[in-house]
Amino acid sequence: MTPDGAVDYDGAATLAAYLVDDMRSEGLVVSGTTGEAPTTTDAEKQRLIEVVKDAVGDRASVVAGVGTNITAHSVELAKQAERAGADGLLVVSPYYSKPAQDALAAHFTAIADSTGLPMLIYDIPGRTAVALATDTLVGLAGHPRIVGIKDAKGDIAASSAVIARTDLAYYSGDDPMTLPLLSVGGIGIISVTAHVVGPRISAMLDAFADGNNAEARQHHLSMLPVNVGLFRNQAAVMTKAAMDLLGLPGGGVRGPLLPASEAERSTLTDDLTAGGVKLPAAGEARATSMNGATL
């Protein structure tokens, strides 16, 4: 965000290129939790997709967060994302209303039916107040465009049950749980900490895929201070503060969030340093530095 609260699209483009070229991200989610999706307008969401697609070209896929607590609105956002050039959709469970399982299935099916894009379901009951049951996910796995799960349920047994009964691609949606999820069949992560330790996350994934569990475990343990630091407050707040510390697009947040305090920034500096993140010296700026918006 710019100082006056507007979306800085130039900053978003700069950050997108950094995440792909420097942090080795193979895909980007636009309008997710860290991108403050609840407080951006539909028009802003569309423009962000277009800007990020232009910035990364064919170097990474662009997935649009389109989930809301209104089915018809989510369907319209999905159609808008397809028109804007998104490569896929990420759809969080509808929040606040606490739908029953059959209603959740109907909600996700309506969105998946509305476009030709592949779709990931975001299961995060800590934010939505309702968890997706195993049988619900198994049933949804039969839809040809529902291809995977962003899993932030924090229940390895439940995740394992779905993995065992479906071909859904399971991505961790909680950074500290990535390695445990890989051990039961997960394939990757949709990450917050990849904003600062992307290459190390890639190295952990590669080590695990190569059967080098000790190396994967060491990467996992070495990143724990970063995981702690970026979640001491809401992820968008702390990630934007981290981007500012790195001389990258960060900027403010929209209410009801507040920016990180000076005390929080100081603690975050210590956390990142403990996690092996090299921060620019005071007054030193990256060539790509500018005020902007975290995706």
Identify the residue ranges that each predicted region occupies.
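Active-site beta->alpha loop and helix N-cap motifs at the rims of alpha/beta catalytic domains
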Residues: 1-129, 137-139
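Residue-level signature of catalytic and energy-coupling elements of molecular machines
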Residues: 5, 149, 268
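A general structural signal for well-ordered alpha-helical segments in protein cores
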Residues: 12, 45, 49, 74, ...
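Positions that flank functional sites
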Residues: 35, 96-97, 126-127, 178, ...
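Short helix-capping segments at alpha-helix termini
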Residues: 54-60, 84-85, 115-117, 141-145, ...
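Helix N-cap/beta->alpha junction signal
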Residues: 70, 174-175, 261
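Catalytic alpha/beta core domains of metabolic enzymes, predominantly
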Residues: 113, 125-231
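Structured C-terminal cap/extension of enzyme domains
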Residues: 182-295
